[in-house]
Amino acid sequence: MKFWRERERENKEQILAPLCGQVRVLVVGDSGVGKTSLVHLINKGSSIVRPPQTIGCTVGVKHITYGSPASSSSSIQGDSERDFFVELWDVSGHERYKDCRSLFYSQINGVIFVHDLSQRRTKTSLQKWASEVAATGTFSAPLPSGGPGGLPVPYIVVGNKADIAAKEGTKGSSGNLVDAARHWVEKQGLLPSSSEDLPLFESFPGNGGLIAAAKETRYDKEALNKFFRMLIRRRYFSDELPAASPWSISPVPTSSSQRLDEITSDDDQFYKRTSFHGDPYKYNNTIPPLPAQRNLTPPPTLYPQQPVSTPDNYTIPRYSLSSVQETTNNGSARSKRMDINV
């Protein structure tokens, strides 16, 4: 019995769950912090020697598979995992595009803030970027409470150019930057290894975030993939989130049954106002319908009405006007001929 119950649930999930989907992630930060190099590293897995200057916005697409948490561990991989596409919108940070880059802030699922570890001012300006996106953007599956600058979607902070910062002695080390950063974040209790969700930092500037060196193809791939899967889960599998989770917001709608009762009661009141008192067939000559058809309205006529044919067994002959005129004319003609003969 349990086997059939699980099989029925898996079939239902396969029918209802989307076969594929997409989430949109903004990549914002000051000009020159390495956003284009980071997006190229995430999508291609390799560094770019001379990244071109971004004009307006550049979109990169990353393919990722996601399995529904409600799927059974014994189910086939093809049935539980589905394909999704992560759109990484690399928005130019140059001041010349300040007045028009809000065109790209639409239907946002998440934000990646990028700053340069060798230039502290680029991290300070992240607050300005958060306020700009929150004020002019539209969002998909927003959070119940906003983050920095009122940003209503999940975000993550990436400190890029850790290799340059290490050489200058500003921040970082010459060792494995990914392991060092992950160890520090887990030590601070910000990134539990057993959790699907990533920490959201409350304000800028602050300690924490991911460390990357796009030129040396170093970044925390696992953490970013968790971030992308969290966005997919919030958009396409929101019913599987815990009830008290802060990741979803849903106003309390009017239930369909309550609305149906209201409509039914209104119809009853209208029927009571327009109904006859007593038997409506008592004071006219109409024949009452069958009891089962009393409250049913006749179906609409979908074809033109045909004229009723008259039977031919009448005792009184009927003549048309033309035949009468023809008979009259024949009689007058005969009388004239008789007069002539006489």
Swiss-Prot record:
GO terms for biological process: circadian regulation of gene expression; photomorphogenesis. Keywords: Cytoplasm, GTP-binding, Nucleotide-binding, Nucleus. InterPro entries: P-loop_NTPase, Sigma_54_int_dom_ATP-bd_1, Small_GTPase. GTP binds at residues 29-36, 90-94, 160-163. Disruption phenotype: Short-period phenotype even in darkness and short hypocotyls in response to red and blue light but not to far-red light. Altered cell shape and increased ploidy levels at the seedling stage. Hypersensitivity to salt stress. The keyword Cytoplasm applies. GO terms for molecular function: GTP binding; GTPase activity. It is found in: Nucleus; Cytoplasm. Residues 12-285 are annotated as: Small GTPase-like. Induction: Not regulated by the circadian clock. One of its GO terms (cellular component) is cytoplasm. Residues 274-313, 323-342 are annotated as: Disordered. Pfam families: Ras. Residues 323-333 have a biased composition (Polar residues). Coiled coil: none annotated. Its main location: nucleus. Functional small GTPase that acts as a negative factor controlling the light-dependent period shortening of circadian rhythms and light-induced phase resetting during the subjective night. May protect the clock from excessive or mistimed light. Suppresses red and blue light-mediated photomorphogenesis and is required for light-controlled inhibition of endoreplication and tolerance to salt stress. The entrainment of the circadian clock is independent from the other pleiotropic effects. Could be a regulator of seedling establishment. Belongs to the small GTPase superfamily. This is Small GTPase LIP1. It comes from Arabidopsis thaliana.
